[in-house]
């Protein structure tokens, strides 16, 4: 190759190198979502408040204030027990990890409990007494309920011998293996564990998305609160679905979708399992 030929090719090569460098920089640039539409926390970003071996965090609202919903987390160590107590308002507890030892009644009997594993959702009936403990692997719990749920004591007759460990008139536990799933038009599957997102009231729903499954851009009438139970979800904001302008969130991440904000989400090379909660209609 002659010198004159090289001189002719060199400018074009420089341009191509600049283009490729620009593409590489763009590919590596971090994606920033509109946090007024959708906020999130990675597992390492959750600011647990530790006290006497127990971690807690209010994600939304205030359980002491009546009239609104609240969302919170609780992490308890092995052999941590509550005294029998009640709550005056509706609430739902999802076991995220570990073993939740649940029971009902005014007298604590640690041999009369039901061991509930990850994926179990418990409905606690207002005004009914219950207590709980923690298995050897600890437990992490996700709560959604109506405000005013300060713990209190009440008078209730002792439970008669026999019968189930958990009185279903006081506490209803739905285990993952017993849930019935339906297939949505977009290829995902879901189960409405308690409530229904299309109707008024609190709801708790599980959603599973296969690999390479995406929603359209959409919005919700009310705030929605999501926990990644397994896999990785990719989330974006805005009215145009752009799979390259998303943030990947692994198991243990939390998402808050604000009412009427337009967003989208999907999966890439693996399935995802989501806990979806809120106040309907969604």
Language-model regions: role of each:
Residues 106-127, 239-260:
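Short acidic-glycine-tyrosine-enriched beta hairpin
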Residues 2-14:
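Bacterial N-terminal signal peptides that target proteins for export
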Residues 12-22:
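Bacterial N-terminal signal peptides
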Residues 70-87, 126, 203-220:
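Conserved short histidine dyad/triad with adjacent acidic residue
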Residues 126-150, 259-282:
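Ligand-binding loop in jelly-roll beta-barrel domains
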Residues 77-78, 87-107, 210-213, 220-240:
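Glycine- and acidic-residue-biased ligand/ion/polar-headgroup-sensing regions
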Residues 82-84, 101-103, 124, 129-135, ...:
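Short beta-strand His + acidic residue motifs that chelate non-heme Fe in jelly-roll/DSBH
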Residues 27-70, 153-203:
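A short, N-terminal "cap"/entry segment at the start of jelly-roll beta-barrel domains
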